[in-house]
């Protein structure tokens, strides 16, 4: 990436995510009063005193407990530290140092990066200095009293931090494609991301809902850069309490909006559920390119009709995203995983594609000759004067007609099908804007406007 990385390390519930949000200037890491909310490592851009860098939020470190996700969180923290240029060790100034802090400090002293000790929750500057002084005993140098919530003391910490960061590599113009990986809990989104990245970048567990943040991972294939956004699994609203999971789902929807292409991951064993349909509808509403990824295909018992039957079911259940490519993969074995990126690249190209006005009107002329527009009860027939593409991402075509309400849904779908059959647009939704226009306005338009259909 070219930017120095700063790892944020500490035991659970000391305010690491709050500090990350303070440094990055946005609430991206989930902050909640439930201990251990951050499980994976999350990369965010930060800026201080003309220096750009990335901060990496990690899960809460606990060395003397191997239950649940704790060994995996340690692995994530170690991976973050391995790629970091510096680390900020966050401790709780209100409770003072404890044995967990001492264990982490001992581990950090063995690491080859400079470590800065941030004593958080020092809300009073006078009292904060006293609270911070207790942490000299950790042997990591000067403790910096800070308040991640209010920002007190973070300037002094960052002033010292940036002195130890290596020079920023000049970044080339980035041609990355942003991909959001979405789906219900436990369909294999994180396994898929790890298969792309070639490392255990995200905690993978059979327990539903292991991933809580939207996390960015950067990969490159054949000169093309991809930014992969893994997201918390999306459940039905009635099964969500308004705590951490509520914020995760909200962030997953934001990840869809950030993305160029969305991977809708479906569990091959469960088939298409009502929630999958709602997610597909969300992708369509946001106008995003999409690839449908049917995961766990290796676990499906197959005969000569399996793929045919599955495709018919997908076509029936996801008919409103029939324009999206579908691929059957196994994130665990790696089967066809790399092929996904080829489909993503093609979908992204179609999403950004622009078609000339003359070509659009040739398609319209043929479509109208094959199937005339509807006629009103009074005998007045609908007329399409001309069409022109007005934007991309998604491709959006304005159709100027004599009376928009005269064109019913069936005819509108027919025109969209004609555009797809003649022009492609595989992998992306297209939007048609039906605009009423009086014929005299059309005839008085500029001479180089599209020919009337």
Curated annotation (Swiss-Prot):
Protein name: GTPase Der
Keywords, in A-Z order: GTP-binding, Nucleotide-binding, Repeat, Ribosome biogenesis
Taxonomic source organism: Trichormus variabilis (strain ATCC 29413 / PCC 7937)
This protein's encoding gene: der
Pfam families, sorted: KH_dom-like (PF14714), MMR_HSR1 (PF01926)
Subunit-structure text: Associates with the 50S ribosomal subunit.
Family from the record: Belongs to the TRAFAC class TrmE-Era-EngA-EngB-Septin-like GTPase superfamily. EngA (Der) GTPase family.
Coiled coil: none
Domain KH-like: 353-438
Gene Ontology BP, a term: ribosome biogenesis
Domain EngA-type G: 4-169, 177-352
GO MF terms, alphabetically ordered: GTP binding; ribosome binding
Gene3D superfamilies, alphabetized: 3.30.300.20, P-loop containing nucleotide triphosphate hydrolases
Binding positions for GTP 2 per the UniProt entry: 183-190, 230-234, 295-298
